[in-house]
A protein has these predicted regions:
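N-terminal "arm"/small-domain region of PLP-dependent enzymes with the aminotransferase-like
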Residues: 2, 6-67, 75-76
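Buried hydrophobic positions in well-ordered alpha/beta secondary-structure cores of metabolic enzymes
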Residues: 29, 77, 95, 110, ...
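Conserved N-terminal alpha-helix of the aminotransferase class I/II PLP-enzyme fold
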Residues: 45-97, 119-126
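Short acidic loop-to-helix transition motifs that present clustered carboxylates
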Residues: 93-96, 139-144
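Conserved PLP-anchoring active-site segment centered on the Schiff-base-forming lysine
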Residues: 102-118, 137
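A glycine-rich helix N-cap at a beta->alpha junction
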Residues: 127, 131-140
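Short amphipathic alpha-helix with an adjacent loop that forms part of the alpha/beta core around
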Residues: 143-153
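Active-site core of PLP-dependent enzymes with the aminotransferase class I/II
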Residues: 162-167
Length: 167
């Protein structure tokens, strides 16, 4: 790691973001991570690759799942946010889908504003086929949300600037 001699607690935010604990050291002394253009990775054995696919060992199996470039980006975002981890998604819809599918299960409820991106509206309607109840409200406002909250409510979903009416 670059700047190993500096204690991380002494680093200011910008320095920590560039060189903090979550940021990997780079090959050949590079000051930024290389852009990985590899689409597949080889390993000594199929057992080693199987462990990577099952998330029982670190490594990369296929670039759409992850690669060193995306890993460096996720580590920096995590450092920026001070989180437990980060996942980079290829689109906003993949981020929304991953978020909802990791929180919800059959029998859960969602309260959602009706002024959402069309793909998000479609996803929410599709979730109903899996036993997830979606309650739509015209605007994301506390007065409209509170009466709908139940023990089964897991998500209140809205957009900062709703489509198409900007409400």
């Amino acid at each position: 790691m670059l700047y190993e001699c500096i204690k991380e607690s002494a680093m200011k935010f910008q320095t920590r973001l560039l060189h903090g604990k979550s940021v990997q050291s780079y090959e050949a002394g590079a000051t930024v991570p290389a852009i990985s253009q590899c689409n597949a990775y080889s390993y000594e054995s199929s057992e080693q690759l199987e462990k990577i696919f099952q998330n029982r060992a670190p490594g990369f199996a296929y670039t759409r799942i992850g690669n060193p470039t995306v890993d460096a980006f996720e580590r920096r975002v995590n450092e920026l946010e001070g989180g437990m981890g980060a996942i980079a998604c290829s689109s906003g819809m993949s981020a929304v889908t991953l978020s909802l599918l990791n929180i919800l299960q059959s029998g859960d409820e969602v309260i959602a504003g009706s002024g959402l991106f069309g793909g998000t509206l479609d996803l929410l309607h599709d979730l109903e086929a899996f036993g997830i109840i979606v309650k739509f409200i015209p605007r994301v406002e506390k007065a409209l949300i509170e009466p709908l909250i139940s023990e089964k409510t897991k998500v209140v979903f809205g957009e900062i600037i709703g489509n198409p009416g900007l409400n």
